[in-house]
Amino acid sequence: MKFSLSWLREHLDFTASVEEICARLNIIGLEVEGVENPADRLVGFRTAKIVEAHRHPDADRLQVCRVAAGAGFEDVQVVCGAPNARAGLHVIFATPGTYVPGLDITIKKGKIRGQDSGGMLCSLRELGIGEESNGIAELSETAPIGESYAAYAELDDPVIEIAITPNRGDALSIRGIARDLAAGGIGHLKPWLTEAVEGDFPSPLTWKTEHPACPYIVGRVIRGVKNGPSPDWLQRRLESVGVKPISALVDVTNYLTYDLGRPLHVFDVAKLKGDTLTVTHAARETFTGLDGREYVLGTEDMIIVDEAGVQSLAGLIGGESSGVDENTIDVFVESALFDPVRIALTGRRLAIHTDARQRFERGIDPAQVLNGLEAATVMIRDLCGGEVSEITEAGALPDWKRTARLRFERLKTLGGVDIAADDTVRSLEHLGFEVTERTEDAATFLVPSWRNDIASGQVLAQAPTLDEDVASRAASHVQAMEAECDLLEEVLRLYGLDNVPAVALPQTTVVPAPAVTPLQARAALLRRVCAARGLTETVGFSFVAQDDAALFGDVPETQHLLNPIATDLDQLRPTPLINLARALSRNLARGLGLSGEGALFEVGPSFDATGQHLRLAGLRAGLTAREPGVAAHEATLWEAKADLTAALVALGVPEAALSVTADAPGFYHPGRSGQVRQGPKMVLGTFGELHPRVARALGLSGTVVAFEVYLDQVPLPKAKRKAAPVLSPLQPVRRDFAFVAGPDVEIQAVLKAARMADRNLVQDVRLFDVFEGGSLPEGHRSLGVEVVLQPQSESLTDTQLEAVSKSVEAAVLKATGAVLRR
C-alpha cells in the first residue's frame, strides 16, 4: 500500500517528519517497505524561459535558443530540436551534470553541429513523469524563472510504501492509516463527512441481488456527465501510488478506493440493456473484462448481468462491454458489500489481481456502502457535471455491530506490561472503539465497523467427539477469548512491542523436559532408516487436489477447504503418497530416476474422518539397485515390503511378530499388495504396487511400488535394557538359495524358517527374486533367498558352510515343504 505525504494530510493534521512517521508506522504494526521522493530524481531541473529562438545555421530541424534559468544561468545558449520551442515559452531546463531518467543520460556542455549548448530543454517523458512526447513541456506563463521544477510542480512529496497483513483491510486506505497514526501519537485525525446528495429524478436502473455473497448493493444514475481528463491534482495523486490516470469517471473510483478503502464501479448506461442489473450466479460462460482478458466462469462465481449478459465480475473487475469512455454521457455508479471468501476464491481461480479484490477479500467497512456512493457522487458531479438520480438499492445491510470484552488484568498476565485502565480505554477509543460498559476490572467495547478482524465470530470447529452442548459452550468461550486477545493486541501495538520487557520463563523443575516427544523421536529415526535405504526425503503440502484425493478413496466434505491457497490444493490429503507420486512424476520426466530421485519418502500428516494422523510413506519407481555394485532393475513390491519391514523393526517391532494379509486398500494392485499386521487386528502398514489406474492418473508409468507405516498405531517397545551388540571383526558370508514353493506357501514362512535354521550364524534373510513359469510345475514359484551368515570367532570353513546350507534347506523343507531348486 502506497500513499504520499500530501494525501495523508487530507486526513491527518501533523507536523512530524517522514522519518518520525515511518518509525511510528513500524511500531504500530504497519511495516514500512520503502520511502521514495520523486523530487530526488529531479535535482538539477529548473523552470526557465526561452528569451530568443532562431534556426540553427547548419540544421533545419534544430533551433538555437537563449534561455534564462535563474542564478548562474541567466543567459544560456541551448540547441534544441523540439518543434514547439519558441521565444517567450516557459520550459523545464536541465543544467549540466543533471541525470535525465527518461533518457538514462547525464547532461554535459558541448557543441551540437558547431553551436555551443549549455544544457537541455526537456519533455515530461524525459523526466520520467509523463507520456507526452510532442516536444518540450510547456509551462504556464506565470511559472517563475529559476525555481526547482520539483517544487514548482509540487512533486516534492515523499511516497511511503507499507506492507499490509491479511487481517488489516482497514489499512488499505489512507484514512485507515491516518487513524492508526493518530492513535499512535502522530497528529490528529481530521473529521470526514460526506454530503448526502438529494436525487433529482427516480433512477432508471434498479438493483436485484440473487447471490448470497452480495447481501447489500446500492447505486444511482448520473446523467449528462462530461468524461474528460482528470484535473492535475487528481492525476498526481493517482500516479504517486502507481495508478495510471484514465479518465475522470474511472479516476474518481480509483481515488476513493485508495482514499477510503471503498471500491466502486461505473457502468455506461447507454451500453446496458434493460432497466435492471442483477447480482447472480454465473453459468458456465465466458466474460471479457476491462483488461481485455477473456475469463471462463464457474457456477459459484458472482456476476452482475443485464438483459444482454454479463457486465461485471462482481467485486473483481468490470466488463469491457459496459465500460465508460470519452463518449459516456450517462453513468451508473455501483457501491456494494461482497463476501470476502467468495471474492478470494474467484479471484484466485481466475488469477485476477485488482485493487478491488485486494480490499474486498480482506473485508471492507460495511457502514460505508452508502457513504462511499455519496462521496463518488459529489466528486463526479464536481468534476464531470450532470444530474443525480435517487439511490436504488437491493438487499439489506447486515448487522455488523459486535462487542468485545477486555479484563484489564490480562494486560499484565498475558501481555507482560502494566498499563493503567484509563490509558487502556483511551488507546482503544483512539482506534474507534466505543465503551458500552465498564467496571473496575473490565470494559466492554463496541467494535468499529471497519475492523472486520476483531471479534469476527469465526471460530475453528470443535472436536467431532464432543457432545453438541459441550462443543457449543467451548466455541463460545473460544470466541470470547479470541476477542479479548484482539483487544489486547491493539493496546500492545500502540504501547509498542519494543517496550514489552523480556522475561525469562519460570523454571518449574530442575530436570528439563525432553526436547522431543516419543512420536517426534520415532519420526526422526524413520527418516534416518529410509535415507540409509536409499530413499530421498521430501516435504509436501498437507493440501492436494480433490481429484487426486479421490483416487485414494472417499473424499469427505469435512476435508474440503473452503478457502484454499490454490485451486489445485483444495483438499486435506488422505495420504502423503499423493505428494510423493506427483514429485516422482516430475523427477522421472526430467530423467532423475537413477540417482535416488526415483525413490522418495515423507514423514508427514494424513487426514481422515477421525482426525489427523502421522504416517511414513515411500515410493519407488524406475530403476533401482539391490545394493551398490549390483545392476539396477525395475522396482518390485518386495523392495516396498523390505522398506516397510525395516521401518517397523527400527521402531522395535519384532519381525517374527509380523504377518501379511491380502486386504490392502483399493489404490494398490489387488494381487500385488498386502497389509502388515501385528496380531489379527493391529494394522501397522501397507505395501504393494500402485494400481495402474491410480499411477496413470498421477502421471506415472511402469511399475510403481509404495508403502505406508501408520506411526500412530505402532506400539511403543517395552522398556528393556539391552546388552550392547557384539560386533564381529570377520566379514559376513552371503549364500543364495532358490526354493521351489507350492501355491499355498507363504513367503514369510520360508524366510522365517531360514532365519531359525541357525540362530548363532544366520544374521539376516532377504528375498531378492520370485520366478514363475518355465520348467516349474503349474502354480509353483521359485523364491530367491539371500542368507547372510556372520561368523563370530573364526572364519567359516567349506565344511561348516556346507553344513549351514543343509540346515537352512532342511528347516525350510520341514516348515513349508519348499525344496531346493536343482
Curated annotation (Swiss-Prot):
One of its GO terms (biological process) is phenylalanyl-tRNA aminoacylation. It comes from the Bacteria. GO terms for cellular component: phenylalanine-tRNA ligase complex. It is found in: Cytoplasm. Residues 39-150 form the tRNA-binding domain. It catalyses: tRNA(Phe) + L-phenylalanine + ATP = L-phenylalanyl-tRNA(Phe) + AMP + diphosphate + H(+). Coiled coil: none annotated. Its main location: cytoplasm. InterPro entries: aa-tRNA-synth_II/BPL/LPL (IPR045864), B3/B4_tRNA-bd (IPR005146), DNA-bd_dom_put_sf (IPR009061), Fdx_antiC-bd (IPR005121), Fdx_antiC-bd_sf (IPR036690), NA-bd_OB-fold (IPR012340), Phe-tRNA-ligase_IIc_bsu (IPR045060), Phe-tRNA-ligase_IIc_bsu_bact (IPR004532). Its cofactor is Mg(2+). This is Phenylalanine--tRNA ligase beta subunit. It comes from Gluconobacter oxydans (strain 621H) (Gluconobacter suboxydans).
